[in-house]
């Protein structure tokens, strides 16, 4: 019960002994306590001491923000799910850690992205780098970026290599549009170049990414809710906001219009960091409310278990979860989350995963590579993860930069290549909501249910808490539960 007392204390509320003993005897004191805090705040937060008499009073007063259901939630008696896992690396992710695996990994990446680039009409006549001759021939080549740098005259040099050789590509700063485009090129991505061969260099006239075609909008007769970065077990986990979300999705919270939207939700997609984890960063134990990883997942099972069973929940791990650190991450191991695995409507998949939700191709990726992209590319930031997602789509790779903050497993196949263009790309990690529709693809970052951490305060990162994006029959809506 010290945890319950702490919950009230963090909200500036003390508990009299009689109220404490009554709470202790209740079936679910944690949930009741959270509900009481919500009710106290909704009444102006004027009470600083919770008494037994106030318990009686609160249980007789409806929260004005909470509308009691006027009958059962109107959802189909039996739902037919047309759910398909298109890509899940949980059981096909292998590496021995030998140098041969790393060579195979980069060969896989190069081959996959080269095939995509070769389909571009501008690169139909591309030739191997080793076949480049002297003179001033107009050429097209495809290669992996080995290095990117500026010269002392502020021209851009891109070192390209393929399976036959290497070449330096020059982008003149007088070509403003192309130079600006070249500033978004990062190491280890695969690009195509059209230009003129001049001595040891190719002077670029155009640079091509694998890119994405504009896709046709997918018709939907249902809704999908998206969340991520719940961080259960942290002292900064916003349990009250999460409980409001659960009540809403169950049809017990919100206006009639909001309850109608809840009834339409068929899928809930969770993009990682379900729990806060253990030993993720130095000093984390000081910020934990639950210091055992098994107990964190037990609490997660309690909270997610309250979500109505006619919603299919699709869940992947993030860097705070108990899966391995290197991407692609297999699904959360059952040995750490047995109670969570007992919830029959949860599908546990890898990070990343590609699924079909009644025909809506949904690519789910936690988003750790956003750190590398924000540090490497001018104009990209955590606050605008939609722009990062746009770049990753154009590069057709979820984590193009190797060897920086995002650990990548050197496997025989690169599973982070975006082979198939999704209708939805759902991410998390940065704790800041973002949305953009790009070439018909819904780019969604679902924010967090964790308030600002000490780390975020240092870097002035302001999270958007308790804001849940819902794709309502093809139209994006944002619900706030904070």
UniProtKB/Swiss-Prot annotation:
One of its GO terms (molecular function) is DNA binding. GO terms for cellular component: DNA polymerase complex. SUPFAM superfamilies: Metallo-dependent phosphatases, Nucleic acid-binding proteins. The keyword Transferase applies. GO terms for biological process: DNA catabolic process; DNA strand elongation involved in DNA replication. It comes from the Archaea. InterPro entries: DNA_pol_a/d/e_bsu (IPR007185), DNA_pol_delta/II_ssu (IPR024826), Metallo-depent_PP-like (IPR029052), NA-bd_OB-fold (IPR012340), NA-bd_OB_tRNA (IPR004365), Pol2_small_arc (IPR011149). Belongs to the DNA polymerase delta/II small subunit family. Possesses two activities: a DNA synthesis (polymerase) and an exonucleolytic activity that degrades single-stranded DNA in the 3' to 5' direction. Has a template-primer preference which is characteristic of a replicative DNA polymerase. Heterodimer of a large subunit and a small subunit. NCBIfam families: PRK04036.1-3, PRK04036.1-5. This is DNA polymerase II small subunit. It comes from Methanothermobacter thermautotrophicus (strain ATCC 29096 / DSM 1053 / JCM 10044 / NBRC 100330 / Delta H).
């Amino acid at each position: 019960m010290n945890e319950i007392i702490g919950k009230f204390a963090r909200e500036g509320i003390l508990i009299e002994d009689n109220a404490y003993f009554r709470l202790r005897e209740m079936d679910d004191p944690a949930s009741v306590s959270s509900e009481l805090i919500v009710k106290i705040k909704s009444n102006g937060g004027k009470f600083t001491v919770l008494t037994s008499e106030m318990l009686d009073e609160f249980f007789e007063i409806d929260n004005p923000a909470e509308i009691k259901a006027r009958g059962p939630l109107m959802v189909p008696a039996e739902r037919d799910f047309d759910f398909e896992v298109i890509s899940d690396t949980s059981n096909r992710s292998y590496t021995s850690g030998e140098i041969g695996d790393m060579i195979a990994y980069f060969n896989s990446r190069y081959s996959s992205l080269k095939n995509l680039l070769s389909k571009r009409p501008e690169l139909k006549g591309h030739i191997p780098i080793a076949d480049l001759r002297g003179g001033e021939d107009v050429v097209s080549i495809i290669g992996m970026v080995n290095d990117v740098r500026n010269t002392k005259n502020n021209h851009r040099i891109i070192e390209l290599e393929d399976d036959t050789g290497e070449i330096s590509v020059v982008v003149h700063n007088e070509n403003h549009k192309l130079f600006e485009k070249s500033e978004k090129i990062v190491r280890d991505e695969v690009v195509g170049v059209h230009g003129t061969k001049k001595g040891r260099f190719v002077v670029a006239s155009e640079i091509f990414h694998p890119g994405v075609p504009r896709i046709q909008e997918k018709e939907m007769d249902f809704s999908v809710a998206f969340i991520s970065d719940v961080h259960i077990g942290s002292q900064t986990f916003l349990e009250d906001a999460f409980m409001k979300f659960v009540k809403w999705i169950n049809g017990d919270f919100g206006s009639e219009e909001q309850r109608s939207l809840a009834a339409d939700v068929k899928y809930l997609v969770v993009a990682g960091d379900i729990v806060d984890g253990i030993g993720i960063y130095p000093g984390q134990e000081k910020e934990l409310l639950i210091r055992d990883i098994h107990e964190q997942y037990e609490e997660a099972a309690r909270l997610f278990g309250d979500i109505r069973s006619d919603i299919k929940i699709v869940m992947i791990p993030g860097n705070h979860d108990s899966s391995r650190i290197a991407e692609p991450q297999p699904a959360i191991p059952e040995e750490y989350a047995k109670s969570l695995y007992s919830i029959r409507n949860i599908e546990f998949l890898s990070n990343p995963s590609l699924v079909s939700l009644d025909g809506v191709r949904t690519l789910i990726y936690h988003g750790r590579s956003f750190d590398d992209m924000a540090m490497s590319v001018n104009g990209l930031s955590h606050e605008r993860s939609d722009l990062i997602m746009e770049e990753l789509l154009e590069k057709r790779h979820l984590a193009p930069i190797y060897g920086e903050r995002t650990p990548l497993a050197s496997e025989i196949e690169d599973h982070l290549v975006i082979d198939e263009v999704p209708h939805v790309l759902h991410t998390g990690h940065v704790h800041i909501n973002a949305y953009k529709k790009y070439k018909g693809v819904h780019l969604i970052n679902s924010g967090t249910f964790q308030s600002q951490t000490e780390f975020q305060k240092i870097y002035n990162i302001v999270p958007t808490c308790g804001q849940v994006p819902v794709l309502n029959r093809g139209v994006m809506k944002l619900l706030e539960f904070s």
